[in-house]
């Protein structure tokens, strides 16, 4: 296995990835043409990886068949240019295995496996779940540690244990435990990817390999420049980019659900023609869109605020 260096961390899935939204038609169907066009747009704007059917892809409200068709559409559009990961995590190990095998058959380059949610497994059960899924295909696995949604963290010793599996190679970290992250980075060869746009720069400075971002839908080139600056040891430039993007992070990640806001941002910037989401989520309100437009303008990412 290759080893990281002070200048170049391990990057099994690239550096700048979006947790890609799933476009829907006005009638609520998955819009495969829009999904393919969005994938091309992201690749042309700083991304070297995409995650399909993650939380921001509204995976809890898409069927297995829809997930498969969506993944294939993205792979057909950009699979020869960037890393494409399939979100396959559920709170049912057997179902996760089914999704993982379907993703492998479709041609995915890797799997994103979130901590099982709601049933709150203890750490030994988490390790069993992750290694069982990793055993089930030949694809590399990125774990997704997000206790704010799943209810359970992946503890440091559990990460160290599962890192011994040859196909568990990365972690999407949205836990907010800088101390624990430092220990895992020191004790394993797991590649860390920031899963929280508010702490992209701190995690990169700690040695993270890259980001799996929501805000990158409208700031991919900026985040690519941030990663490059950190690689070059130019934290002054990296910090300037981080500071410039703060209003966008606020607008997309704090005023409503990230997927709701980022779909509105993609509509504001002309990338998507609508901002439909699936219930129980609701689209951004006119007031939310106006506030978001102001935040994007402050970050230099959109025109002046729209009238509500």
UniProtKB/Swiss-Prot annotation:
InterPro entries: Aldolase_TIM, DapA, DapA-like, Schiff_base-form_aldolases_AS, Schiff_base-form_aldolases_CS. It comes from Kineococcus radiotolerans (strain ATCC BAA-149 / DSM 14245 / SRS30216). Pyruvate binds at residues 56, 212. It catalyses: L-aspartate 4-semialdehyde + pyruvate = (2S,4S)-4-hydroxy-2,3,4,5-tetrahydrodipicolinate + H2O + H(+). Catalyzes the condensation of (S)-aspartate-beta-semialdehyde [(S)-ASA] and pyruvate to 4-hydroxy-tetrahydrodipicolinate (HTPA). The active site is at 144 (proton donor/acceptor), 172 (schiff-base intermediate with substrate). Its EC number is 4.3.3.7. The keyword Amino-acid biosynthesis applies. GO terms for cellular component: cytosol. The keyword Membrane does not apply. One of its GO terms (biological process) is lysine biosynthetic process via diaminopimelate. Belongs to the DapA family. GO terms for molecular function: 4-hydroxy-tetrahydrodipicolinate synthase activity. This is 4-hydroxy-tetrahydrodipicolinate synthase. The gene is dapA. It comes from the Bacteria. Keywords: Amino-acid biosynthesis, Cytoplasm, Diaminopimelate biosynthesis, Lyase, Lysine biosynthesis, Schiff base. Homotetramer; dimer of dimers. Pathway: Amino-acid biosynthesis; L-lysine biosynthesis via DAP pathway; (S)-tetrahydrodipicolinate from L-aspartate: step 3/4. The record marks 55, 118 as: Part of a proton relay during catalysis. Gene3D superfamilies: Aldolase class I (3.20.20.70). It is found in: Cytoplasm.
């Amino acid at each position: 296995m290759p080893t990281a260096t002070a200048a170049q961390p391990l990057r099994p899935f690239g550096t700048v990835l979006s947790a890609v939204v799933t476009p829907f038609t006005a009638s609520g169907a998955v819009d495969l043409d829009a999904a393919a066009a969005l994938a091309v747009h992201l690749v042309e704007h700083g991304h070297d990886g995409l995650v399909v059917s993650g939380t921001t892809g509204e995976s809890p409200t898409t069927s297995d068949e829809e997930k498969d068709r969506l993944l294939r559409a993205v792979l057909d559009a950009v699979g020869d240019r960037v890393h494409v990961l399939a979100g396959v995590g559920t709170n049912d190990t057997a179902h996760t295995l089914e999704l993982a095998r379907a993703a492998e058959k479709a041609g995915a380059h890797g799997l994103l496996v979130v901590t099982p949610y709601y049933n709150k497994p203890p750490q030994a059960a988490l390790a069993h779940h992750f290694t069982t899924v990793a055993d089930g295909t030949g694809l590399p696995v990125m774990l997704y540690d997000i206790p704010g949604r799943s209810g359970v963290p992946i503890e440091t010793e559990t990460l160290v244990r599962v890192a011994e599996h040859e196909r568990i190679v990365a972690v999407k970290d949205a836990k907010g435990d800088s101390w624990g992250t430092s220990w895992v980075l020191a004790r394993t060869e797991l590649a860390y990817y920031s899963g929280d746009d508010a702490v992209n720069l701190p995690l990169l400075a700690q040695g993270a390999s890259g980001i799996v971002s929501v805000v990158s839908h409208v700031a991919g080139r900026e985040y690519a420049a941030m990663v490059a600056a950190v690689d070059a040891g130019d934290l002054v430039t990296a910090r300037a980019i981080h500071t410039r993007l703060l209003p966008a992070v606020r607008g997309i990640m704090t005023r409503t659900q990230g997927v709701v806001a980022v779909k509105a941002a993609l509509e504001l910037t002309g990338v998507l023609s609508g901002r439909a989401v699936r219930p129980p989520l609701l689209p951004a309100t006119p007031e939310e869109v106006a506030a978001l437009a102001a935040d994007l303008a402050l970050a230099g990412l959109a025109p002046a605020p729209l009238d509500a």
